[in-house]
Amino acid sequence: MMVNTGLDNKYQFENFIEKDGNALAKKGSLAVVENLGLKYNPLYIYGESGSGKTHLLQAIGNKVFENNPEKRVKYISAENLLENELEIQKVRSEEFDLLIVDDIQILGEKDDMIQEKFFNLFNSLHVKDKQIVLSSDSEPDQLKNVQSRLIVRFKWGMTACLTSIE
């Protein structure tokens, strides 16, 4: 059965514009690709709009899928993932090897029940060494209205800042 990965293959590491302000994030992303679920889990990338977060997240997914087509990869925006409990449950039941969630700061706009469901999803993946990659417009400690137990988990792996590519 073919799963919709949500990936756009135009986003690759090869066409990611590397500079001083994003070298660490790229290096961490490549380490995740090579050590899926074992290194920097979760990988949390933050930066302002236009800094290349989505490009880097998509490149991770594309490279994992290219290297290991049998791996189950899902890229999804936080808005789509967190729109209701059923979507979270659907993603949880799919047993992805790599879950990439873009714009996780949206979690702060959701009620405790949705945050609880995401907490459970995160834990169910992490305990099985499934890789989680998150992006946000701010570092974990600056997330507004996100439960502290989630913020703690977001910092378990590697946190990397991207500076704008402009």
Enumerate the language-model features and the residues they cover:
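Short regulatory helix/loop adjacent to the ATP-binding pocket of P-loop NTPases
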Residues: 140-156
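Walker B catalytic acidic pair
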Residues: 102-104, 137
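Conserved Walker B catalytic segment
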Residues: 105-128, 147-148
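AAA+/P-loop NTPase substrate/partner-engagement loops
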Residues: 25, 63-98, 107
